[in-house]
Amino acid sequence: MSDRVRFEVAPASSYAGTGYDLVTTFDCLHDMGDPVGAARHVRQSMAADGTWMIVEPAAGDRVEDNCNPVGRAFYGFSTLLCTPASLSQEVGLALGAQAGEAAIRDVVTRAGLTRFRRASETPFNAVFEARP
């Protein structure tokens, strides 16, 4: 499998390679200072029929949608970790852990991807599929 799979450490906006069938991000898009820039790079690195699998914390689009035990915990984590991390980077969009589907969809569409859907979810995470 080493001829088909590799792991690299690189900035989300400049990792190497093109023509990827699948790009995955796990619980990180909301922490990025420039998630739109990272999403644009994902789009550029994907094959024409590629897929981007985005795993993000489960969240509703409105504050009142997140007034539950998990949402409250995620707001706490977001205040302590996610938002300051994003603000400390270039652009500093600060989506936070409770960004919600609409905010993630907006990032993806602004990056030039045209198809977006919620593919799966758990009480803690939402899995989105984005395609060119």
Regions found by a protein language model. Name each.
Residues 36-49:
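A short glycine-rich, Lys/Arg-flanked "PGG" loop and its adjoining helix->strand segment in the class I
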Residues 52-53, 115:
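A short hydrophobic/small-residue beta-strand
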Residues 1-12:
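Conserved SAM-binding strand-loop segment of SAM-dependent methyltransferases
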